């Protein structure tokens, strides 16, 4: 399938989730947790949100907003001292 803005956001988000320890495909080996790299992807998506403001369809906006929310919540949970 062709790459769309939404699929691009989902791909980046999935990478960030995997870097935070999520195993998206049970048939694949998990990768080591790397919170700084996961945060870098979150920051990249945040810049993308700022730079595309007013130029996205409502569906694209929703995908980006929801992905950023999920990633930020997961990151805060993992990065908080226990």
Language-model regions: role of each:
Residues 1-82:
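Long, contiguous alpha-helical segments
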């Amino acid at each position: 399938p062709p790459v769309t803005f939404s699929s691009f956001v989902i791909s980046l988000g999935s990478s960030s989730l995997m870097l935070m320890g999520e195993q998206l495909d049970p048939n694949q080996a998990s990768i080591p947790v790397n919170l700084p790299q996961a945060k870098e992807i979150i920051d990249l998506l945040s810049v993308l949100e700022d730079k595309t403001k007013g130029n996205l369809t409502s569906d694209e906006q929703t995908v980006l907003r929801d992905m950023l929310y999920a990633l930020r919540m997961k990151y805060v949970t993992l990065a908080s001292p226990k």
